Amino acid sequence: MKYVFFIILFFLIFTPSCNNQNQKIEDIFHKIETEDAKIISAEIVNNNTFNIVLSEVVEILEFSINGEENKEKILGKEFSFPLGRTIEMGEKVTIALTYRKNGGNTTRAYFTLYGKNTRKANLLINEVSIKGTKTLPDRVELLVTKSGNIAGFELTDDLDSTPLTLPSLEVERGDIIVIYWNSKTNKEDYIRENGKHTYFLSGNMANTLISTTGALILFDEHDGTIVDGILYSDFSSSDYGKDKYEKCETLLVENNEWYGEPISSEYVTASRVLTRLKGGVD
């Protein structure tokens, strides 16, 4: 009995505990290690199909699009799931996927993807109002330099926060898009004297733009390419917004989108804005 007790005690001491949260499990009898299968790629193709590739064979246990679940079990490494319809350019789709590797853990993965914009316009940040009031709120003006669609373009003043995503809108070269950053506007679009359109969009962002030292970056899609950006500062000693500014500055400089000092915001008021083209675009 003493020998039996010693063997059981040795097994309890030296057997590693199993925790469902562990990403790696070791089989102490066969020395076989298993890890969760890794996601190699995940994308929307032709705006009607979700494709995903994993590092090894798994069993799909559940798949959902915008909360609509499909629990048909499928085995494989590469999968294509129809979205049920062709989504709009720039339209957001939330996808959840539950899969299990043979002998491994069950993994739940979430994706936020957007309908691909196949006719991208070219845009520039033309004016920025950073000291808005109730009657003249913060605004961002974009100038269209090439005709196309603005669906899925993203504007952000903080790389750690949710960006502003532009809706599907067909625009022509020379058109202007005025975005009321953290408010709603009821202004109607109109045609200027030169025949070009001015469009008004409600941003409804949670916070105003920083009125002292800040940045604004424009991407052509979610996690996409930087197409424009600005840095501005009143050159005060205040640390307010400094972390946000420095992260944006680093990204713009590393991508050759900014050189030298930021634009001075010292004399900006509610009616005096940061502008690219003196006197406007007309």
Name each model feature, range by range.
Residues 1-4, 20:
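Positively charged n-region of N-terminal signal peptides that target proteins for export
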Residues 14-17:
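C-terminal motif of bacterial Sec signal peptides marking the signal peptidase cleavage site
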Residues 19-33, 40-47, 105-161, 208-210, ...:
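A structural motif detector for short, solvent-exposed N-terminal "entry" segments of globular domains
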Residues 46, 75-77:
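Residue-level recognition of beta-strand termini and adjacent short loop/turns
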Residues 50, 138-144, 214-218, 274:
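Buried hydrophobic-core signal for structured, non-transmembrane domains
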Residues 50, 54, 63-65, 79-105, ...:
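Extracytoplasmic/surface-exposed domains of secreted proteins
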Residues 51-73, 153-155:
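Short, surface-exposed alpha-helix to beta-strand junction/turn motifs within ectodomains of secreted
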Residues 86-89, 168, 172-282:
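Solvent-exposed beta-edge/loop recognition patches
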